[in-house]
Amino acid sequence: MNTLANIQELARALRNMIRTGIIVETDLNAGRCRVQTGGMCTDWLQWLTHRAGRSRTWWAPSVGEQVLILAVGGELDTAFVLPGIYSGDNPSPSVSADALHIRFPDGAVIEYEPETSALTVSGIKTASVTASGSVTATVPVVMVKASTRVTLDTPEVVCTNRLITGTLEVQKGGTMRGNIEHTGGELSSNGKVLHTHKHPGDSGGTTGSPL
């Protein structure tokens, strides 16, 4: 190979070492994609991920995403794809200097904003946490808002201190221990108001059943 050819080959390799492009196809089963760069489309290339050993991550790039092509030795056939670069079609979803912000195609958002120390998850339909041992939340105040119902499906619920509730319905019986104080309303048992019902019979003897 003459000197001119060597220079041209070297220039080609240098041009190909780092290129930008747009993903045009993805093969999720193979973990590969094809990228349009300049006037050509690459072969199926692997994309880079955060971890790929004992701990592994998965976050597939999407069609239309702008990426870098990293070609070792300038050979595009064996290059790797590094997502992603903001573009006019896919601009930055946040302008915060410090926030971690993830926006998904369905509109769901996960964000942690250090300026307000606020973690926000919005736009999701369901959430599931499964633990084989326990789940602990330690916080001064917990607020749960449910428009329909909150279900505690467990053999036992323990409240270690005061319980305040607007209404209470017990369906399968139970026991109470300790002093009970009732004020501000009627307390009835089997249709009889306890503090107003009367008993027939002589006041000096055993009374009858409540009226």
UniProtKB/Swiss-Prot annotation:
<keyword id="KW-1245">Viral tail assembly</keyword>
<keyword id="KW-1234">Viral attachment to host entry receptor</keyword>
<feature type="binding site">
    <location>
        <position position="203"/>
    </location>
    <ligand>
        <name>Ca(2+)</name>
    </ligand>
</feature>
<keyword id="KW-1226">Viral baseplate protein</keyword>
<feature type="binding site">
    <location>
        <position position="199"/>
    </location>
    <ligand>
        <name>Fe cation</name>
    </ligand>
</feature>
<keyword id="KW-0946">Virion</keyword>
<dbReference type="GO" id="GO:0098025">
    <property type="term" value="C:virus tail, baseplate"/>
</dbReference>
<keyword id="KW-1172">Pore-mediated penetration of viral genome into host cell</keyword>
<keyword id="KW-0479">Metal-binding</keyword>
<dbReference type="Pfam" id="PF04717">
    <property type="entry name" value="Phage_base_V"/>
</dbReference>
<dbReference type="GO" id="GO:0044694">
    <property type="term" value="P:symbiont genome entry into host cell via pore formation in plasma membrane"/>
</dbReference>
<keyword id="KW-1227">Viral tail protein</keyword>
<dbReference type="InterPro" id="IPR013046">
    <property type="entry name" value="GpV/Gp45"/>
</dbReference>
<dbReference type="GO" id="GO:0046872">
    <property type="term" value="F:metal ion binding"/>
</dbReference>
<protein>
    <recommendedName>
        <fullName>Spike protein</fullName>
    </recommendedName>
</protein>
<dbReference type="InterPro" id="IPR037026">
    <property type="entry name" value="Vgr_OB-fold_dom_sf"/>
</dbReference>
<feature type="binding site">
    <location>
        <position position="50"/>
    </location>
    <ligand>
        <name>chloride</name>
    </ligand>
</feature>
<keyword id="KW-1160">Virus entry into host cell</keyword>
<feature type="region of interest" description="Disordered">
    <location>
        <begin position="183"/>
        <end position="211"/>
    </location>
</feature>
<dbReference type="InterPro" id="IPR006531">
    <property type="entry name" value="Gp5/Vgr_OB"/>
</dbReference>
<keyword id="KW-1161">Viral attachment to host cell</keyword>
<comment type="function">
    <text>Forms the small spikes on the baseplate that plug the end of the tube before DNA ejection and form a channel perforating the host membrane during ejection. Involved in baseplate assembly.</text>
</comment>
<keyword id="KW-0945">Host-virus interaction</keyword>
<dbReference type="InterPro" id="IPR040629">
    <property type="entry name" value="Phage_spike"/>
</dbReference>
<comment type="similarity">
    <text>Belongs to the P2likevirus spike protein family.</text>
</comment>
<keyword id="KW-1188">Viral release from host cell</keyword>
<keyword id="KW-1162">Viral penetration into host cytoplasm</keyword>
<dbReference type="GO" id="GO:0098003">
    <property type="term" value="P:viral tail assembly"/>
</dbReference>
<dbReference type="Pfam" id="PF18715">
    <property type="entry name" value="Phage_spike"/>
</dbReference>
<feature type="compositionally biased region" description="Gly residues">
    <location>
        <begin position="202"/>
        <end position="211"/>
    </location>
</feature>
<comment type="subunit">
    <text>homotrimer.</text>
</comment>
<feature type="binding site">
    <location>
        <position position="202"/>
    </location>
    <ligand>
        <name>Ca(2+)</name>
    </ligand>
</feature>
<feature type="binding site">
    <location>
        <position position="197"/>
    </location>
    <ligand>
        <name>Fe cation</name>
    </ligand>
</feature>
<dbReference type="GO" id="GO:0098670">
    <property type="term" value="P:entry receptor-mediated virion attachment to host cell"/>
</dbReference>
<keyword id="KW-0426">Late protein</keyword>
